[in-house]
Each structure stands twice: as C-alpha cells, then as structure tokens.
Amino acid sequence: MGDDGFLDQYPANTDAGIGTVHSCRYSKQKNPVQNNDFLSCSMCIHNGPIKLYGIFSGFNGGDSTAKFVMNRLVYEIFGENPITPTLLPYQVVEEFKRKFENVAERYLLMNTDDLNNRLLKLEEQSETGNNAVSEINQKIRQGTTAIVVMIINQDLYVLNCGNSLAIAMNSENVVQLNSNLHNNDNPLEIVRIKGLGINPETVLNPTRAIGDLQRTHLFEETEAFKNAKGPPVISTPDVQYTKIDPSWRHLVLISDGVVQNLKEVEVENIPTEVSVRLIEDHTVTSTAQALVDSFARKHRDAYTMSDDKNFCISNHREEMTVIYVKLEEDYQAALYEQFDSAISTMESTNATLYEPCSTPYVDATNFNSGKNYEKMKKLLLTRPSK
C-alpha cells in the first residue's frame, strides 16, 4: 500500500514489551482453533526524548490499513514539521490530532482510484462489473482503530480512535487514561449518531476508525444510513493530556479485542481487571505476554463453563494485543536530567513546525456522477496531504 518503512528508522523502547494472542474459534469440544491471520500491528519506538507506544487493530479482513496508518503516523510525528519538546501541551494536543487526521486523509487519497473505478463498474450492470465491485468492496471495507501514547519528558498524551484502552497504575491505584471508547453504547457517540438521524443500534462497532470506507464515505448506499446527515463512522480521534504521576509504575495499552473479550465475559471494570492480572515477569515482553495470555484463558474458561444453551459468550475469541511499559521508579528526576539536552537537540527542527501544508493536485474529473460525487470531489480537492 505504500508509505511503509517509516517505523523501521527509529530505535525500539527498551522499557516496553508487546504480547499478542491470535483470534480463534472454539470447536464443538470447546477447544480453541487458532486463526493464523493477524490483523493488528503495534509499535514501541523513540526519537530522542519523545516515546511512542501504539496498537493499531485492523478489522474486516486485512492488516494493510493498520500497517499503513502506523507507519504514516510515525512519519507525521517525526518527519516533516515534527512534534517537538518545545511545544506547549495544548499545542501538542492540537498537532497530535491534526497529524492523525492527515493520515486519514492520506489513506482516502490512496484509495481514490478504487473508489473511482467502483463507480464506473456499478454502472456496467454486468457479471464482470459486479465481480469487480465485490473485489473492491472487500478492499475498502478494511479499517483500523488506534490507541497511541506519546510521552515527551513528563507529559503524557493519549490518542484514541476506536475502542482500545490506555491505563496507568501503581500498587494501589489504577487510572484509565482515555475516557471514551468509541462504541455504539457510549453516551457521547449515541448523541453524535442520533444527531445524524441514525439509530445507534444499526451501527456496528467501532464507531470511529480510519478506513472502513463503505461506512465513512459510501454510507448512503446502506439502507439504514441512506437519509443520514453524515457518516456514522468517523476518523476524528480523542487526544487527552496528563502529567505523569511520580507514583505510577506501569502503563498498559490493551487493544479493542481485549476490551471486547473481557466485556463478553462480563468484566465490569476492565482497568481493575488489568491491574489484578498484571504480574511482573523477568522481562517486559514476558510480562506483556503473560498478561494477554491470562485474558485468553479467562475467555476460554468462561466459554468452557458456559451451558450449551448460553449464547452470551461467542464461540469466537477476538485477537488481542497488550503493550506493557515499565516506568522508572525515579522517573520524574530522570526526566529533568534529560530536559536540557532535549531542548537543544530538537530546537533546529522546531523552526519548520508552522510551515503550511501544501494542497495536492488530485484529478477528480473522471468521477462518475453518483450520490457521492460532489461530496467525494470536494473532499479530495480541498483536504491536504503529507
């Protein structure tokens, strides 16, 4: 899909480990049958004093969208017009959000040819045309959610687009760092979706993501959304800022698959469940893997003990990813020691921060005049990329 490889330019964080569990279906004997396809990707990297930790959970059949979004976001943050330690927190929040939205726009631009071709094939009304449309639909259905933690010295920023979680904890307290999960039962999402004239129950989760173009840009083709005032699924993220509490010892990021699996087995307080199950192992990676394995066992045990007539627990377990970050015990003091060198290192790049983005040339003249023509043309001609 392009734009790959930006991630590989930066070193990995040694304070973090990643654990994963594949999705599976339970057989009639209630044994898990693993699905070998893994749709998500994750990162733990740094560029000088800026650390990034992120999980990108792909859905609807492929990991290409998740990989693209992860790599492109790294470029947006560290590449041209980078985020730097000299920015004030409110500026970082604004830039973090804007750069994620740039990624969403870039993704749409990369799929312009497919969307254009799809409109042409729809008019053919032939078997060949229908087959081509089905193939394109399979591609443009792919999407990804994202949860990204960025640490700049003692400031912590959480970007969430979807239904994953970031949690901070010590031996006594647990703090959920992102307050909203973008699901159809979230009060804020219910208000947003109802305001579009849509019944929230007709919108499958997640209600925010990048990609999923049939619901974000071709939504009027769906019967339940044909009279909607706007798309039921959007790519606008939430970005929240907080100071790192010196008492925090751990950060944990959990994918939407973890959240869904735990909800299915009726875990009411997911952050507390995470803190109870977190046991430090020999390495950060083994700690992360042990944590996600414990979630997998919990789901399997609940399914195994359920009655055959109990349909509350699905025979499908979602794939899961956990990132575990071990914070230094004297984290705040270490940050102050790094601060002066961070300022001098990043000053030279900060001068380019406020350069305006250029508007790309996009040829939209061959778009067919369907329902989405004016909307797609306006979107592609007016939004910036890179």
Swiss-Prot record:
Q: Where is this site: Required for interaction with mom-4?
A: 364
Q: Which GO terms describe its molecular function?
A: mitogen-activated protein kinase binding; mitogen-activated protein kinase kinase kinase binding; protein kinase activator activity; protein serine/threonine phosphatase activity
Q: What GO biological process, any one, is recorded here?
A: negative regulation of gene expression, epigenetic
Q: Which residue intervals define the domain PPM-type phosphatase in the entry?
A: 22-327
- Source domain of life is Eukaryota
Residues spanning the membrane: none
PROSITE patterns attached to this UniProt entry: PPM_2
Q: What CDD domains does its record include?
A: PP2Cc
Phenotype of the disrupted gene, per the record: RNAi-mediated knockdown causes no obvious phenotype. Results in a 3-fold increase in the number of animals lacking a gut in a mom-4 (or11) mutant background.
Subunit structure comment from the entry: Interacts with mom-4; the interaction enhances mom-4 kinase activity.
What is the documented function of this protein? Involved in the Wnt signaling pathway by regulating mom-4 kinase activity.
Protein name as catalogued? TGF-beta-activated kinase 1 and MAP3K7-binding protein 1
Organism from which the protein derives: Caenorhabditis elegans
As recorded in Swiss-Prot or TrEMBL, the protein's gene is named tap-1
